[in-house]
C-alpha cells in the first residue's frame, strides 16, 4: 500500500471516440481518484451509467439529455478552439496534481481526432504518466525508458512520430539495440516473449502499442 501523500493522484479521461466496454470503464474508474469526461465522452458514460466527476470541453458534442443526466456533476465549458477537448481535460488535471492518467475513447471515430489525440500526448509526458487504452489494447508515449507488463505472444508495435534514435528493446522477439527509426519505417507486429517488455528511446517521440487481441494482420 503506498504511503499517504506519496502516491500520485490518478484519473480516467473518457473521450468521444470508440466507446470502451462498460466492464473496462467501470473497472478503470473504480481504481481512479477522478473520472473526467472530455465533452462527448459523457454520452458514453451515460450509456454505461457510470457518473463522471467532471465534464469539460467546448460542449459541442455532449447531448442535452446527457447534460440533464449529469445534473450534480461539475460541468466546465472552455470555449477556446485552439486545443482539443482531451487537452482541456489534461490541462485541468494538471491543476489538480494528477500524475497518472488513463485515457479511454481516444481512438476510433473521426480519424483526424484520433491522430490529434495521439499527437498531443508528448506535450504532457514530462508532467504526468499517460496511457491510452481500449478493450484489449494499450498505447504508451515513450519518454526515456518504458517498462510495461505484456501478456506473452501479445503484439507490440512501435510507431515513431518523426525521427527516433537510441532505440533499445527488451523482452521482444525482434530486439533492437541503439537503433534508429523514422516515420514510415516498419516497427509493427513485434511479439512479446516475456511478461515484462522494455523500450528505450533516447531521442524522438515513439508510441508503443500493445495489442492482446488475436486478430489477423491487415497487411
Residue ranges, per PLM feature:
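Short phosphate-binding loop-to-helix
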Residues: 75-96
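N-terminal beta-strand-loop-alpha-helix module at the start
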Residues: 1-69
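Short, well-ordered alpha-helix to beta-strand connector turns
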Residues: 32, 52, 72-73, 98, ...
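General beta-strand structural signal in soluble alpha/beta enzymes
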Residues: 14, 36-39, 57, 77, ...
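Class I SAM-dependent methyltransferase SAM-binding "motif I" and its flanking Rossmann-like core
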Residues: 122-151, 156
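Long, charged alpha-helical interface segments
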Residues: 142-219
